[in-house]
Amino acid sequence: MKRKSLICLVMVLLLLSTFVLAACGGDDDEKGTTVVFWANCNDVELRVFQEIVKKFNEKFKGEINVKMVPKTGESYGDMLGITLQGSKAPDVFYVGDSGYKEYAELGYLYDITDFIEESDIYNVEDMWSDVAVRYKYDTTTRLTNTPNSRYYGVPKDIGPTVLYYNETLFKGAGITILSVDEKGLDAFNAGGKDDRGNTKADLGLGDYTVKQQGFFEVGGRKYFNNSIPMSWEETNACANLVQSYMRNTLKDKNGYGYFTEWWFNYGWTVGGDCIQQIPSDDPSLNGYYYDFTLMEDTPNYIVADDCASLQVNGKTYTAGQIIEYQDKIDMSGYSSDPTGNAAKKDSYKVTEEVERLADEGKLNCLPSQRDAFTEFVRLASKTDTVVDIVDGEKLYGYGITPYPASIGGDAGKTVSFMNGRLAMLVDLRYITSTFREEMDGAYEWDVAPLPMYKEYDADGNITVHGVEAGHSGSVALCISSKTKVAPEAWKFIEFCASEEGQSMQAKAGFAIPLQRDLANSPVFLDGHAPRNAKVFIRAAEYETAGDWWYLKNNKWIDTWANVLNGSVRNGKLTMTDFYNSKEYNITFETLVKDYCKK
């Protein structure tokens, strides 16, 4: 009996050891070293990565075998965080850019810097400038892309945000589409064709000289150029026109002309942001602290186009560059001790140097971050709702986007656009694959650049402009710090980033390749919808990570964002009330206490 019990015990232990190897990676005499890969993706991406894993396993048959474990649902992040604390973490896994820094600080992620530097396949220099360094982090100073920063993950792809629009609805509203960017305007105005093969004569433009406008009128006829960003005013006018058609002609009382859930391209186009790094010699801090500037009300400034270069606060700026916060603000208003920042939020002033350069015409004045943020909030508020009162003037809503409460989350906005209830939608590249599957034959649709800040003279010439801005989505592929198969895990990541792996992802539609050259090839520009795919490439050049990436986690955002996306954007709370709210003002303290201490 004892012998039988011993045999049974040995068999159980063997089975358990096999399970552990499968869960954490290990050797398999027949298949080679096992690498466990957790993939958090939708059905389209899942099919692509199943094929990537299959091809990788065929290529490295007998050496490495990747075991893919699909993990779907919104709870993935929580599940991964718990798993990484234990001993059975996957070898390779997805980490969103919002959670990456905290995982690195907690020691969950393997330092893959040496793998990258020694790789003949993974060349950061060939990739979009922002996306790879997004994952280069110094866990001591909590800063990105410093000389001491290390890579704890690499992007599997990049998904820029663009303006999706329903071309069927545009045409129904009497809008003519043209497609010619700034570089092609001279040739187009001289009689050449736009990217759709149309001349000015074909489009009824006659002798009119087309300017750098996204939405304009010629002889009573409306035009939309899907290759040039609209201004804020053009966006509102275009949305109102199509919305009127949807409601009055199509009898869709719940149709809307536009929707965006992100303020980034509104604030960033004029040089604003929600936090600013302030230098400090306080020994308890890391050499800096963060000030909360979501509604900072000093004007922003940009170097005029006819000014080659100038010095501001000892720093050289060239034409079209926005002056950074620390160079425009009189920093003597700040102290090394950040205590009481909330009480000082209205006290900061622009330097005399900046004001003088603006008076000389070398700098152009742009709206403040608060102005830009207010513009964003006005989109959803009804036309009889007071969003704010500025210098005695009541600012009402535009009523061109649905309230967040009525549209729901990601699924709600996606379904609304697919069903023709939204004429324009700001969204990421990943949704392209869904639109291809669900909208084929129902509606024509395409993409355009995100709106940006611009002012025009009476003839439609730009007099003042901001910069193109927006955020791109990205997910990192990371290796567990507890893995026993790091070299093999890196081989798989290399394959995902190779031309073959990136091509497979690009063809499915949910991302654009990491490499610039590959993105500019037929691999990405393959003729599938949307026709104006080059807009994604344009966006990838300048878009950066969202505010959720700035610090190690989202806790500093959640308190004020819940009020913003609740009462404020749903028309129940004015901007001034939001500015004075407890939820807004507690953020100053949270930033210092939880994110800047040594």
Go through each PLM region and give its residues.
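Conserved C-terminal helix/tail region of periplasmic/extracytoplasmic solute-binding proteins
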Residues: 312, 319, 326-332, 339, ...
